[in-house]
Amino acid sequence: MSSPGPTRPLRVALTSYRSKPHCGGQGVYVRQLSRELVGLGHHVEVFSGPPYPELDERVRLTRVPSLDLYAEPDPFRLPRPSEFRDRTDLLEFATMCTAGFPEPRTFCRRVAPILAARASEFDVVHDNQALGPALLTVARAGLPLVATIHHPISVDRELEIAAAPWYRQLTLRRWFGFVRMQARVARQVDHLLVPSLSSSHDAIRDFGLRPDQLHVVPMGVDTDLFRPRGPRVPGRIVALCSADVPLKGLAVLLRALAALPDEHGARLTVVSRPQPGGQTEKLVAELGLAHRVHFAAGLTDAGIAELMASAEVACVPSLYEGFSLPAVEAMASGTALVASDVGALAEVVGRDGRAGVLVPAADVGALTTAIGGLLADPARRTAIGTSARARVEERFSWTATAQATVRVYRRAIAEAAAARNAEQQPVA
């Protein structure tokens, strides 16, 4: 395998074990990064498990089917016997039945032989946080491997276990068993992309990584799609967050909404779908918020952008974020943002208060005060929105993300070529 020159277009295999198109960072990352890479003149083929991404027409998609055991409206379904094709399908089903999450491991088992058989067609493989052991066989076969760690899922694990009743904690530990696998594999990948310094520090701490493995490459936002638009709806607050995931802090936001004075006329739209009968639905009922909270699921990117631009305030109440696409989307929309001062959010928003208001995580009183203050002060909302848009335009473009990613690709390719050449040198 010859190494491409320093300016030659690269042939990139971008892998993602699931790529939900319009929500969740993985699908957005795959779509936007692949689009920008081809815009820079590179050739990209995405290999994805379901749900499959929606990609630029210039990007080739190779579907890597699975049993898709978590698909709505029937998650944790029982497959028909005719659906089982091989041992990997059996492993996927058995892992689900024993309370584990199989997809990162089983996706890599499926995609690795495909990549190995087509190794001559690519210059580099870029894994989007599957980090299954089978991917290492691709690297050993001579294909340079780069991986993205949005943040170590160990953070999600600890927060979910802490929030769960005692009788669910053992099951959650089993569910998050794949995290140990990801840490083991990540330690063997020489080039890892992380979106923030915060994620870098957390990956070093939780995954035992070396600082020299990590490259901080912030994500971007589509500033043509997410932009200031027409008039805003009085009192509208928008949050893009998984409704029943403790990490996202929606319960804190709901309690803050309940505490807001009536004169603000505050109404919350959450871009998510709560679990029927789950903790979020119960809390909405308990707080008497059914008339003030609307859940909007299944929106397109354009629909999300229009909604975000119509709000007076956006909120990211997370207990942790490795980057936060919803935060930069709100900022690009010129919408005044209130966010938790955790993880990478201070890196994204800035600490000077010009582009957004940071509050302590899980502090209902502070969140109530911050949101209420913005709803009562149109001039301050406008000033924050203007500064936020300028910050995004300066720091967070997908083109810059793609350019920085290509620099890491070329470094990984050059190092792999040097290692091959060293192996081929005759022993003196």
Residue ranges of each PLM-predicted region?
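Carbohydrate-associated surface elements
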Residues: 198, 220
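Aromatic "clamp/platform" in nucleotide-sugar-dependent glycosyltransferases that forms part
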Residues: 319
